[in-house]
Amino acid sequence: MKKKIVHPIVLAILDGWGHTNIQQGNAIKIAKTPTIDSLIQAYPSTLLAASGQEVGLPKGQMGNSEVGHTTIGGGRVIQQELVKIGNSIVDNSFFNNLELNEACEYANNNKASLHLIGLCSNGGVHSHIDHLLALIDLADSKQVTNLYLHLITDGRDTSSNSAKYFIKIVADHIEHKQFATISTISGRYYAMDRDFRWSRTQAAYNILTSNNSIKLNASVNYGDLIDHYYNKGISDEFIPPSRINLGSIKDNDAIVFFNFRPDRMRQIVQAFVQKPFNCFATKPLYNLRVVTFTNYDTSLNTTIAFHPHILNNFLGEVLYKYGLKQFRVSETEKYAHVTYFFNGGAEEPFPGEDRELVSSPDVTTYDLSPDMSAELVTQKSISAIKKAIYSCIVINYANADMLGHTGKLKETIQSIETVDRCITELLDAVSKLNGTLIITADHGNAECMFTDEGNPCTAHTTNLVPLILIEGEQEAISGHGGQVKLRNNGSLADIAPTILDILHLKKPPEMTGKSLIINSRYETRNIEKTSIEL
């Protein structure tokens, strides 16, 4: 029996690849990208909203990888945790949150301490400083006796030297609250590692659980501490874990981890709650009450303050229900995004969903290896394409985002040129199977490498992102015998419906996004799409 050849749809997500016509500091425009440039000229393309309300964030809030992949995979706008928690503060339901109130009461009943741990900035990607301030107010209202703040400095989703600004907001907020103390400071490089570089996590853990201080010539207050590292060329992200006041975590204490995004909190939380924990030596701590803002991982024994939405019929689930095979591939930095987030928070793959994890380079920062593992990701993708069994292949290229975060223009340009070469190889493999290649991005970053003042810009942007549709036979999905046309004013929520449109599959009612194809053969010829009970 002759094997059936599947003509795949390959979705290549170029992480951090935004669009702007501004040339200065635009690594994407400066880079030589002959393949992508030629594809934009030769094939249908459009620009998509990837930030703000179009992806379930507050108006004007930059997009990010978690939100981007969730929106792409979901085919709908989902209210994000940043908005959900922010709204709860506005309507005061935050202060009635059972789990947060119980954490305060636990500390009081045990004559112990409450510890708040999280990223201290207004970046809105992993956390928000407003949530921290609300937690402090809640602790005040519950008459917590000892409140210790363990602040993680940002420098990626905010400017690289903004830590003092944000910590001052916190310091001013607790100035007349004698029960509250800023205890430790740590750069996110250490406290928020997600790549199993356990020595970084260990450094953060040790400072949280020990009252030993890093000795400095200057007096230890947050301003002096940060200036000490600035003078050594160390920016916010890389500030070593440092203690500035007493307040280590002890038996019977309560801890609230207030990041709402899970991926960069899992390792540090594991060190406190996972038994046995074998990644590094930990301090015996008993009777801790650990609360996380959101569900960081189903395997972690924590109390969850804000329970997740129940999300059904994401693209992966729909493909599974139609009996189609799919493949996901990325390197370590973005693996969770093409799997967990793309599937709406489902940890396990659906039947028929294969996954491939490619290790990211073992370097301190990615400007030391701008190519990252893009070539190996490409080879794994091509191998999957050649099998001719997958109807949908989802790939993430991490380069533009991870290099954009370094603020290094030259290295970011190199990384973008690497991705362009990889797209050349990918396109050749897709074309040989008469498949469809969709190139898009989850948010902007590398197109804006400098601030208006000329300083390095390491944060994401609110810019639109491109989408290019390369179909071997455009007439196959066009309703008028010519090239496919794509509409404007779309968003990331429209990508999954577009994929289902090309596959001639009916989208589920949960997918409120709409196909980007204007002249789909199914609409112009009134052809009924394949449908099953979803």
From Swiss-Prot:
GO terms assigned for molecular function: manganese ion binding; phosphoglycerate mutase activity
Subcellular location: Plastid, Chloroplast
Known catalytic reactions: (2R)-2-phosphoglycerate = (2R)-3-phosphoglycerate
Keyword S-adenosyl-L-methionine tagged: no
Entry keywords, A to Z: Chloroplast, Glycolysis, Isomerase, Manganese, Metal-binding, Plastid
Binding site for Mn(2+) 1: 401, 405, 460
GO biological process: glucose catabolic process; glycolytic process
Cofactor: Mn(2+)
Database matches in HAMAP family: GpmI
Name the record gives this protein: 2,3-bisphosphoglycerate-independent phosphoglycerate mutase
Record gene name: gpmI
